[in-house]
């Protein structure tokens, strides 16, 4: 426990909060070719690689992911949620924050039903999260 005198000489430092999705907090000025501090809820990007990944220890699956070059020129790995997708290399996608706990290095999700990404087909419940239209009838 520090004394009052020690605290007067050197006060306590406040904790620096680290962002869970740092690529969304950076903008890009293409005229000056400089990165700017400009937070956004989502960002647009181009898929440079689409593939599958195996999750961490207790789980077993082939999780779909895409490597995305964002509009601020940062390249990130994003998870493709839902069953089946239509993404290929050079597809334009929208990403949001949100990590996938069992995939190391995946801090972003691709928004289904936005830009080139189609919604999940034949989805009845939780449709808004997967860009699925309301079924007829």
UniProtKB/Swiss-Prot annotation:
Write out the entry's keywords from A to Z: Ribonucleoprotein, Ribosomal protein, RNA-binding, rRNA-binding, tRNA-binding
User: Which cellular components does GO assign to this protein?
Assistant: small ribosomal subunit
Q: Which GO terms describe its molecular function?
A: rRNA binding; structural constituent of ribosome; tRNA binding
| PANTHER family found in the cross-reference section | 30S RIBOSOMAL PROTEIN S12 FAMILY MEMBER
Query: Which family is this protein grouped under?
Result: Belongs to the universal ribosomal protein uS12 family.
Q: How does the record describe its quaternary structure?
A: Part of the 30S ribosomal subunit. Contacts proteins S8 and S17. May interact with IF1 in the 30S initiation complex.
**What does this gene product do?**
With S4 and S5 plays an important role in translational accuracy. Interacts with and stabilizes bases of the 16S rRNA that are involved in tRNA selection in the A site and with the mRNA backbone. Located at the interface of the 30S and 50S subunits, it traverses the body of the 30S subunit contacting proteins on the other side and probably holding the rRNA structure together. The combined cluster of proteins S8, S12 and S17 appears to hold together the shoulder and platform of the 30S subunit.
Output this protein's name: Small ribosomal subunit protein uS12
The species this protein was found in: Streptococcus pyogenes serotype M1
């Amino acid at each position: 426990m520090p004394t009052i005198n020690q605290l007067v000489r050197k006060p306590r430092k406040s904790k620096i909060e680290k962002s869970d999705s740092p690529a969304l907090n950076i903008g890009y000025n293409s005229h000056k070719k400089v990165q700017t501090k400009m937070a956004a809820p989502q960002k647009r990007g181009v898929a440079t690689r689409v593939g599958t990944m195996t999750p961490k220890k207790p789980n077993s699956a082939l999780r779909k992911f895409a490597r995305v070059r964002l509009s601020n020129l940062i390249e990130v790995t994003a998870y493709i949620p839902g069953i089946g997708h239509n993404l290929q290399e050079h597809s334009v996608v929208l990403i949001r924050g949100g990590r996938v706990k069992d995939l190391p290095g995946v801090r972003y999700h691709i928004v289904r039903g936005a830009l080139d990404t189609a919604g999940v087909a034949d989805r009845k419940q939780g449709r808004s999260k997967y860009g699925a239209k309301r079924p007829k009838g």
